[in-house]
């Protein structure tokens, strides 16, 4: 099944009776791997790719590992709107132009996976197959961020994460062997783990 979805006056016309405001986002964003080959389609990798995260949106900062000279940043797959989790394996795709600024941050702890920074949150991206591995990876990255990068006591990090760090499904493209014909049966996933910036002040 295919359907053309009109976008009119900053609204997405989902059905004859339902229109919603546009919420633009970038589905694919990543850098090049140090070895081997990568794909901006699927799955996602530690250096990014087709993560389909709604937080990769205007005003946010995406932090990516850099493994090669020049980074070779790739951006695409623009969406007019997408629900978190992308349950049908497709968003409301749209043509457009992404205006971004790029900074190289040196002399920091290496990133194990992408992170997204908003005005209010640090968002840690978990990648893995099965999905439990994705969740574990996201938790471990957040824990390292608090303990290694910010000098927290380990016990304090556990307590704050248990109380305030929310987790959710990001997109279904974390599988190492995705089945496009059965998107709702994805065996791996991208997960996101949210830490309020207020805990760092």
Model-derived features: where do they sit?
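Intrinsically disordered, low-complexity linker/loop segments enriched in Gly/Pro
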Residues: 1-57
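TerminUS-proximal long segments
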Residues: 147, 156-201
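Short, compositionally biased
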Residues: 75-92
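Short, Lys/Arg- and Gly-enriched loop/turn segments at beta-strand edges
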Residues: 70-80, 170-173
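A hydrophobic, small-residue-rich beta->alpha segment in the mid-to-C-terminal subdomain
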Residues: 110-162
